[in-house]
Amino acid sequence: MKGYPFLDKANAPFVDRHVTKAGEIFYPWDGKRIDGFGLIGAPLSKSSISHSGASFAPTVIRKCLHAFSTYSVEEDLDLAQLKLTDLGDITMHVTDIVGSQARIEETMTKLLENEQNWQPIVLGGDHSISFPSIKAFASAKGTIGVIQFDAHHDLRNLEDGGPCNGTPFRSLLETGSLVGEHLVQIGIRDFSNSYPYRKYAEKHGVKVYTMKDVNARGLLTILDEAVAKLKRSVDVIYVSVDMDVLDQAHAPGCPAIGPGGMDSTTLLQGIFHLGKDSLVQGMDIVEVDPTLDFREMTSRAAAHVILNYLKGKCIKSIG
């Protein structure tokens, strides 16, 4: 305020002139051409088979981006050179789950058709949003491969509960949007799945890496193997990150927490590794419930997933 140099608006944050916050490099979409990466929220969680406030996640993850800088000390790289788009959120129907999923598919399909250079980063929401999002991605991009980080197969039958957060990949397989041989599941965890769904995955040619595999072989080795396999038969790769792939100590704000999961450093290294591959052109982050979280730990981890993905893409562009 003029004449009062030390008076500022209420709750004004501290500002360091030499620090750019990650949230500052995402600009609201002006409706013009999107050239590169862009966030879009899909705040649907009514389709969860357990209590979930994941519909609040897009807002909180965006907020958490402001908690971190754009500079990677590990790679001596500043993401501030990027201009990224935030397309906002897809409006969900208050009561209609199938209708909400249809809105996601319609919006994503139109955007991917009209904005062919757009590489989406979709913020769920529960994992049910991956079905319409990936279906739209496949429609626009041709033959796709999917790398799924998850504690669960998410191949539940559709008869018992309909299209919920436990069915996205079954829906993709049964609609023909995705071929089983083009789906790689990483981080599948003990006592979090059932035998019939493991057999379903095997029957359809889904490649499954359990946490035992990750611990024994290392995530980067597994990712190199998975990407090499997919590159022989797909045009692009989409990465779906269910945050419950992380151990409950690292992601307390997931509806389906459990022990024996991945640590956050391993996941972030894997996401960075995938980001460096030009075939990887889309991603979603799901199953973050801010109402269950502790000090926004899970939302902050999700924000770091975004930053490490973009770091990989930035390394690729200058390398």
UniProtKB/Swiss-Prot annotation:
Mn(2+) 1 binds at H127, D150, D154, D242. GO terms for biological process: L-histidine catabolic process to glutamate and formamide; L-histidine catabolic process to glutamate and formate; putrescine biosynthetic process from arginine, via agmatine. Pfam families: Arginase. Mn(2+) 2 binds at D150, H152, D242, D244. The keyword Manganese applies. GO terms for molecular function: agmatinase activity; formimidoylglutamase activity; manganese ion binding. Its cofactor is Mn(2+). Belongs to the arginase family. Binds 2 manganese ions per subunit. Coiled coil: none annotated. It comes from Halalkalibacterium halodurans (strain ATCC BAA-125 / DSM 18197 / FERM 7344 / JCM 9153 / C-125) (Bacillus halodurans). Pathway: Amino-acid degradation; L-histidine degradation into L-glutamate; L-glutamate from N-formimidoyl-L-glutamate (hydrolase route): step 1/1. Keywords: Histidine metabolism, Hydrolase, Manganese, Metal-binding. PANTHER family: ARGINASE/AGMATINASE, FORMIMIDOYLGLUTAMASE. It catalyses: N-formimidoyl-L-glutamate + H2O = formamide + L-glutamate. Its EC number is 3.5.3.8. Catalyzes the conversion of N-formimidoyl-L-glutamate to L-glutamate and formamide. InterPro entries: HutG, Ureohydrolase, Ureohydrolase_dom_sf, Ureohydrolase_Mn_BS. This is Formimidoylglutamase.
